[in-house]
From Swiss-Prot:
GO terms for cellular component: chloroplast thylakoid membrane protein complex. Residues 1-21, 22-58 form a transit peptide. This is Protein THYLAKOID RHODANESE-LIKE, chloroplastic. Residues 1-29, 342-476 are annotated as: Disordered. PROSITE patterns: RHODANESE_3 (PS50206). Keywords: Chloroplast, Membrane, Plastid, Thylakoid, Transit peptide, Transmembrane, Transmembrane helix. The keyword Coiled coil does not apply. Component of high molecular weight thylakoid LFNRs-containing protein complexes containing LIR1, LFNR1, LFNR2, TIC62 and TROL proteins. Residues 403-412, 447-476 have a biased composition (Pro residues).
Length: 476
């Protein structure tokens, strides 16, 4: 009858109640015959042992032997295998004798770690790839796009990747760590479908490429990968001998506009203004004709819509064509010349005024007797538009009948001279008409009686035609 033993797992094991029974060592051939269940059990045992090593208390050598004895007695058949000794030689002998068991144990321990690394790395949509892998992805994947985050100066000096094989073009969007929102906005303008776009981030070196890859994937892009060592690194794009476009030495419109959209409106506005200026300079006549036509259309539209404006506009057009544009007839031209050179027809012609006599008291009657010649009939003013104005004659003879002026009067007797003096005084009290005054056109005056002949010599005004003698100075 087998003795019953009690195993206690503790740091200080208790003494055994019965000494262990010596067990014969199984032959080597028997130990090598392993079953599938024994291998699986050993692998699971190693895995569980490794997982719960921190929780289980250490067992002594005697306890390990008792456990192996119990498992061997309970199996009751061949196929069991003996655990190696805890020494280094025993472990090596066990691995050499049981390679499948050792491999299964290592696989059971390493497989969870490998799966965790693989699955954990695949779950992240961003990472770092080599330049060759990045170029291969750009060529093979339709949704892969290259984003060049280098500063504009570096891109102009060094060049850019050549993606003609992939029928794509690198999007130059410089990255500024202080303006992440602006960077994302520029990317959104370049790529309209971020959920299906995989970005390959290229920097000058490793600088900010991985940070940008994480940033863009966190903002809705499918995936992003940073090129290891960037464009100019030791294992970067240039060092991998991938297609590269050398910088352009001449003027390039794409460099002026840039790949971004910030400078596009200003540049296109300047180009449009320059083109319009050149066109206006070369086609100034056509431009003026166009502007004149536009002004005429505006005038017609604003002046002929309403009835009142239409009447007023038509009158202005008629006056313009009749007075300023239409050719004048010869009579109208002569009329304008006569109006400019000759005095107005409304003024009355007056006969020539004789020189006044010496300023003396007796000279007044002589001045009073000087009467005007019969005035010509006043001519009513007529409209200059109705009939052409008659030219004013420069000769005074036209004012007399048959162009004959009155003859010079003969000297009168003293009695008649006194009578004429009284008549001249009475006539002087009346208001004499102003010289060269305009005639009144209300009504034609009655025909005045013919005036007495006016003597041309002052001597008839003195008795016996003798003027008074000058006073002689008195004696002192």
């Amino acid at each position: 009858m087998a003795a019953t033993t009690t195993i206690l797992s503790s740091a200080a094991p208790t003494p055994l109640t019965a000494p262990p029974r010596a067990r014969a060592r199984a032959p080597a051939a028997r130990r090598r015959r392993l079953r599938a269940r024994d291998i699986l059990g050993a692998a699971l045992g190693l895995a569980n042992g490794g997982a719960s090593a921190a929780l289980a208390a250490p067992l002594s050598y005697e306890e390990t032997l008792r456990l192996s004895t119990d498992s061997g007695g309970g199996g009751g058949g061949g196929g069991e295998f003996a655990l190696p000794d805890l020494g280094l030689g025993g472990v090596l002998d066990f691995v050499a004798q049981n390679p499948l068991v050792a491999a299964a144990g290592v696989a059971a321990v390493a497989l969870p770690l490998v799966l965790a690394q693989v699955l954990g790395g695949a779950s992240k949509p961003y990472g770092v790839v080599s330049a060759a892998a990045a170029y291969r992805a750009l060529v093979e994947e339709p949704g892969a796009q290259l984003v060049d985050i280098r500063p504009p100066g570096d891109a102009r000096q060094s060049g850019a990747p050549d993606l003609r094989e992939a029928k794509k073009k690198a999007a130059a969007v410089p990255y500024d760590g202080e303006d992440k929102n602006g960077f994302l906005k520029k990317l959104s303008l370049r790529f309209k479908d971020p959920e299906n776009t995989t970005l390959v981030i290229l920097d000058k070196f490793d600088g900010n490429s991985e940070l940008v890859a994480e940033l863009v994937t966190a903002n809705g892009y499918k995936a992003a990968f940073a090129v290891k060592d960037g464009a100019e690194g030791r294992r970067g794009w240039l060092s991998s001998s991938l297609p590269w476009t050398a910088p352009k030495k001449g003027f390039s419109l794409s460099d002026l506009i840039g790949d971004g959209t910030d400078g596009l409106p200003v540049t296109l506005g300047l180009a449009a203004a320059t083109g319009l200026g050149i066109l206006a300079y070369t086609e100034i006549e056509t431009v003026l004709q166009f502007l004149g036509s536009a002004a005429i259309v505006q005038l017609v539209a604003s002046k002929l819509i309403y009835a009142e404006d239409r009447k007023r506009t038509l009158k202005q057009i008629d006056d313009f064509f009749n007075k300023k544009v239409a050719p004048k007839e010869l009579v109208d031209e002569i009329k304008e010349i006569s109006q400019a050179l000759l005095p107005s027809t409304g003024t009355k012609s007056q006969p020539a005024i004789t020189e006044a006599a010496p300023a003396t008291a007796e000279a007044a009657p002589a001045a009073a007797t000087a009467t005007a010649a019969p005035p010509a009939a006043p001519v009513e003013e007529t409209s200059t538009e109705a009939a052409p104005a008659e030219p004013t004659p420069l000769s005074p003879y036209t004012n007399y009948p048959d162009l004959k002026p009155p003859s010079s009067p003969s000297p009168l007797a003293p009695a008649e001279a006194t009578k004429n003096e009284s008549e001249s005084e009475s006539a002087a009290t009346e208001s004499a008409p102003a010289v060269n005054s305009a005639p009144v056109a209300e009504a034609a005056p009655e025909a005045a009686p013919p005036a007495a002949p006016r003597p041309l010599s002052p001597y008839p005004n003195y008795p016996d035609l003798k003027p008074p003698s000058s006073p002689s100075p008195s004696a002192p």
